[in-house]
Structures are given as C-alpha cells and as structure tokens.
UniProtKB/Swiss-Prot annotation:
Entry's Gene Ontology molecular function annotations: aminoacyl-tRNA deacylase activity; ATP binding; leucine-tRNA ligase activity
Subcellular location: Cytoplasm
Principal place of residence: cytoplasm
Organism from which the protein derives: Campylobacter jejuni subsp. jejuni serotype O:23/36 (strain 81-176)
GO cellular component: cytosol
EC number(s) recorded for this UniProt protein: 6.1.1.4
Protein name, per record: Leucine--tRNA ligase
Family, similarity comment: Belongs to the class-I aminoacyl-tRNA synthetase family.
Taxonomic path: Bacteria, Pseudomonadati, Campylobacterota, Epsilonproteobacteria, Campylobacterales
Amino acid sequence: MAYEASLIEKKWQKIWDENEYFEPKDDLNLPKKYILSMFPYPSGRIHMGHVRNYTIGDALARYYRKIGFNVLHPIGFDSFGMPAENAAIKHKIHPKSWTYENIAYMKKELFSLGFSFSKKRMLATSDPLYTKFEQEFFIKMFEKGLIYTKEANVNWCEQDQTVLANEQVEDGKCWRCGHEVAQKKMPGYYVKITAYAEELLKDLEELKDKWPNQVLTMQENWIGKSEGLEFSLNLDEESKQKTKESSLEVFTTRADTIYGVSYIALAPEHKIVQNLLSQNLLNQDVLNKIKAIQNQSPRERQSSEKEGYFLGIYAIHPLSGEKIPLWVANFILADYGSGAVMAVPAHDERDFEFATKYNLAIKQVIQTQENLPYTQKSGKLIHSQEFDNLDCNEARLKIISQFEAKNIGKRVVNFKIRDWGVSRQRYWGAPIPMIKCQSCGIVPQKLENLPITLPEDVQITGEGNPLDKHPTWKNCICPKCGKEAQKESDTLDTFFESSWYFARFASDEKTWQEKALDEKSVKYWMSVDQYIGGIEHAILHLLYARFFQKALRDLGYLTQNEPFDRLLTQGMVLKDGAKMSKSKGNVVDPDEIIEKYGADTARLFILFAAPPAKELEWNDDAVEGAYRFICKLYDRAQNVKKGELVELKQENLNKEEKYARLKVYEALKKSFEVYHQSFAFNTLIAACMEALNALALCKNEALEQEAFYIILNILEPIIPHVCFELSEELFKCKNFKKLELKEEVFVKDTLNLAVSINGKKRAEFEISSSASKEEILAFAKENTAKWLEGKSIVKEIYVEGKLVNLVIK
C-alpha cells in the first residue's frame, strides 16, 4: 500500500478535532507543561518562519502530552495594527473584515499542518472581550500611578500618522513602514516601566541558563543601569546674565575623572539652550542645526557622527575653579541624567572624538603608557590635586563623598530605559479607556462601561486619526461630574495586547466572560514553561511582557515574577542565502509543500535541516529527501508484526541484531535529551534514520516490531499523522506513552582494545567483555608478538575497557 499523505493527514486531523485531543485537562493536580510559540499577526498567509516556530513548539507539546503531562498549547492572533488600515486604504475593505477573513484562512492553514493547538482557548486581541479586560488593566494601572499623561517629544511617523516607541524606530525609520521618523511634541499616555527598571534588571539573573545570553545582554543594555555622581556647576557671571540661569546639574559615572573635564555637553532640549534660543542669542546657522538635531530620534543621535556648537557661555569647575565651556551636542539625550554631561576626552572615546573634531583641550588624569583615550577604570590618578596617586575606584568614592559633604552633589542611580509611550493616532487598535472633561480633567471610564469599542462607520484615508474625525463616537458624559465630555481618541500601541496574552491563555476559557484572569488556573499554568519566538523581539515584546507580569502581580492578578521560564529564539528561514520575501521572489508557500508532499514532510524537513536556534536554508532536494524517508518508513511498517510486543531476550540476539537494537535504544535515549533540553531535533531524526538502516540488515520479526514500537513513539511529535496511522495499525497506539530504557541493551558483549608498545599503537583486537585482566594481557601479547620478539617486558598496563600498554626494553 503506497503512502498517501493527504488521506492520512485529513483522517487524523478530523479524529483529533472530534475528540478534542489537544484540549488541556481540568485536573489541576496533574504535572503541567505550558508550551507557547509567539502568536502571529494575521497578515493573510502563514510563511515558513511561522511553520518553523510552530513546528518546534508542537513537537514539544506533543511529546509532553504523550508522556502524561497536562499540556496547554494555545494559539491566537495579534490582530490589531497598522497593516489592517493600510489594507483598508489599498483594497477598499474595512480593517475588521480584512483582519477576520485573514484569521479564518490562517486557522485553516495552521491546522492543516497538524499543530496540536487548543481550539477552545483561541483568541484574537481585537475581540471585544479581550479589549474589555485590557482596558480594565489600563484603568487599574492608571489608578496605581503606573500610567500617566505628559507632553513630550515623541517619535512621529508621518506616513502612518502615529507615535512610535523608541524600540520601534530602526535606523531612524519606522519599524512597520520604513518611513523616516521625526521628533514631535505631543501629549500622550505613558506606562511607567521605569518603576520596575531595577527589578527587571535584577530578575535577569533568574533567567540565566534558561534564556539565550544574547537576549539577556540586549535587555541588560537596554535597561542601562549606571551609578554615578550628580552635581551642580555654577555659571560665570556673564553666562548667568545670558541664560537667566545660575547653575546646571551634571551626571557622571566617572567621578574619578572630574579633574579631566574640558567641556560640558548639553542636549539641544536643555533649558539653558532653549533660553539662549528664545533670546535669539545664537546665530541662524546654529539655530537651524539645533532644530535638525531635535528632529532626530534618540537612536539616530547616538549613532550618527558627533556634532556640536559652542554656546559662548561657561561654567565654573566645582573643585578647581576653572572655567569650562558649554557646548550643545547631538549625542546628549535630554531624558538621560540631567541632559548635561561632563566631557573628559582623555578617558572617553566619544568625548575624545568630539574634542579632536573641535580642537578642545584633552586633560589626562589617569596614569597610563597607552595612547589616549585611556578608558579603563583602573590606574592611579594624576593632575587631580589631593586625589593624586589614588586608585580610580578609591578616588571615585572619595570624590563623591567630598561632593556630598559640600552639599554640591549626590550619589545617584540612572537608567537608560525610558517610560513607554502607548498612545497611537490610528483607528485599528484598542481604544484608550479615558475621558477628557473640561471640569474634571482626565477621568477613567467606569469598569461597567467596558469594553469601549470602535465605531465601524469610519473612513480610513491614511490621514490623521479616524476616531478624532468621527461625528459622534467621541461624545460622552463624564462619569465624575455628569457633564458633557469626550472619549480619548488615541488607541493603544499593539505591544500592549501582546504583553499579557499568555496569561489570558492560561485562564480557564469557561471564565473568560466574567473575569480577565482566573486566579486558580493562572496560578497552575503560569509561568510559560517554554516560549518560542524570534530574537527580534528581545527588547520589544519580551521586555514589555516581563513588565506586565510584574505589574499584574502587584495589582493582584498574577503571582509569578516572570512570564516565561525558558526561551528559545529560533533562526530565520532563508532561501538562496536571503530571508524569504516577496520582493526577492524567494518565498516558498507552505500550502504548496503540503499539497505536494504532505504536512509531515514539511515538519520533518523543518526540524531536520538545522538546529532550531540556527538559520535554516531552504533546500528543495532536502524536502524531497524528507518525503522519501517517510515513504520508506511507511513501506517498511507494512511488514511489521501487528499486536502485542513479543518479548526479546538480549542473549538470544546475534551481533547484527544487538547492534540494531542498540541503535534503536540510543535513539530513544537521545529523545529524552532532545525533548527535555537541547531541542536538537536534527540529531534525533538522524539517530532514528541510523537505527532503521541498521535494522534493515536484520531478519528478526520480534526485533523489528520492538524497533517500530519505539521509533514511532520517538517520531510522533515530529511527523504525527503518519506515526498515528502506523501505530494504530500495528499497536492500537499503545506505544504512545513514556518508554523506558533497557540497560541490558547498552551492555557490550565484546571489547575493542588497542595495544601500544612504549606508547606507540601496534595492534587492535576484540575480546569478550567478561575476559579477565590476565586473559586480556595474554591476548595483547599474542597480537603483538613480532614487536616483542627478543625484548623483555618491563611493565604491563591495562586501562579498563580501553587499551593495553606494554613497556619493553
């Protein structure tokens, strides 16, 4: 009977669906595994990146389900976002219609691959019920002070007409559409992620050895903790008159280099710079250049060439009394420290580059024989008055103490991470549940009025915010004073939705109507045991999700500190050496692979072609090879004895049979390590192939039966349809359980030993593993007789199970 993938796969998908085979059990006393792959945006079609992500997760979910765990393996759709509005403009279709049509199609595609997702817990973040509880979280965070409003410079995408978080600006461009990003002052809502900066940093320790080091490092750098000295510098008299300011605050992490200051660098937004601008004390050329810098995103300003302009004013060094020139510089950010930095060119690369460019003084204050800039935090101080000859660390502490004693400075901790701006000027997003009242100011919606949903009678033109232009939607009554008011017309950044979906999945779906999160079930299921997704989310989704977990914990919704226990970041799928994209013409459609070869072939290729964390190069020949392997497995199974296993006696097997059985059990042993720890599915598949090849050389019916019992068990999470089909036919699926190793299989009957004479290998021989040391030495001498002739043996050494060494003279 030939292998017919389509018939087999449709048959088993129907059986699994009808029997709700993949739904988590209600028994919360069972050991659990929560396996989650990052959910997709419903763009219309799944791509090979999705297939890889979900195949990895599905293999793990199926494995743990098979060995007796209660498994939660859900899927949903991150369904709010700008592409739906872009599609509405392009295709003259409502964003909601476009989104839910795509969801319906993608669901069909996902289940055609045999993914064992829970259907009962499937959700879309644009569902009104999801929006309701998201808005509840927003209000609770607002009431706790974790969300606030402010007017600030924001990253503005002119094309999408919306605000972007710092993390959403890539090389000065919008991460979604690629348009240049400008700075624009706007009011908006901010999530106080900085309130958790210390905990977010500290808890990275808990994730070591469970998350990729690269992700941990990226988050650590993004949070950017620095400890240092914040101090005041008085301006000289003339500068006071010009700026209408008497002093400025400066932050430094290198108090030990304070005598090396040769200029102060200010952010363009600093009040001293703004005072000079407002009084027209800077020439037009400088004014234009400062405005150009202000239009750059923070990331652009720090990555572009260093630029600055002397402001014609001076500060007084607090210890030496020297005059220090003040410059405006593009690499200084207004919201880091005080927006003013003391520059020490001799001991900082950035300051050195700037000073060299503008011919500013370079004052060395740490002794070194190396070329400047010398940036190490070690060495003896020089040219630093009473702190000369002190080590850097000791000097830093003493200088900070002196500033504190004089009451002109203090020890402070700064973080690079900024609060998260979540206001977006677009239609297809969750409405921010706030009201603007002329009498009461900003007031939260009443919880009983949630969800605040979107009006459907809107015109999506791509210009401005459709909610702002709607004739009636904004109108409401203030819940506080009863007067006429207006709803907030901004919607939430879509990262807000993806920051808690994992907890919603963990909540029993029978409680979804009544509450955001069911305490009992989220306590059981959370944290996610294994999370799978791309490394591109390291400082976006993953950081926001960690914050949300902690915030919801403190609001009483959750109990765990971290959302994801283990993280796997899978590599990209490439074709012709490049990431698959329509523009490159190198896209492989999963539907075409399924139609031609079947879902199991697609799954097998994806897991065999490369380790999960590495990039995977698409190879048509390798897909063909995966298909041939499944056909071979299917054909070989037709000759396997059906029914109960016949007990095998190891001692009754010949050499070839023992070797084949060993290969089968080695594959089983490897499966434990792969499914539990390394996820190196490619090595596991290779081990199964090797076992089948060894088995082909044997003619033992009972051995072949046992081998298929085990191999189908091992491969079921990877190629489930064909393994279910064959296991049902051969064993009534009784092999789908936790299997045990048989230690006697690993015991070797013979030893292969090397014989060395005076350390030089001369021979190899095979001998019974039960042979005594005396027998082994005698056999070794017999096999090396020609080298021993006429010589006397001084010493005989036997390294058990490995070699014999004879020392002669």
